[in-house]
Amino acid sequence: FPALNARPKELLDEWLAALTAQIDAARRADPGRKVGPFAVNQIVHHSNDRLDHDVALCVKHKVPMIITSLRAPGDVVKEVHGYGGIVFHDVINVRHAQKALEAGVDGLILVAAGAGGHAGTLSPFVLVSEVRRFWDGPIALSGAMTNGAQILAAQAMGADLAYMGTRFIPTPEAKAVHADK
């Protein structure tokens, strides 16, 4: 979830504490049950005046995965790696992918054309192919993912994961307004 969704910013600490407690309780109640990690999205652009605050809370709660966007996340990577977390970074082109990798990210989220409300304009075929020329680590493909056939196509192109967002807006868990659902 995006850290900036917590308003006021102090709410993020409550959310992370509650989420961590619920996950820990689920694991204790059924040790054999697979309980997936969660991720917090951080906008590392200079316009985000909450970044230091929000990253400090993610470090405090040892958020397993941080997803960054809008600038190479060097400082965030160091802090997250300090407690054993991982960082995936949103990229829309090859140059941004290279900069993110130089910053030490663990994986890339390739935001291709069709990613609702995002800046990706490249064909997923081109973007995955070009990035795979220099990166053999984890790639999640974002953009126009709505069903299993598209996920299979993403894997066939060389992506390890499919990143789906819009499809979840109508779910009961999403707090989107009814008109958007």
Each predicted region: which residue ranges?
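Active-site entrance/lid segments in N-terminal catalytic domains of soluble metabolic enzymes
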Residues: 1-138
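Conserved active-site-proximal phosphate/metal-binding subdomains
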Residues: 121-136, 140, 146-181
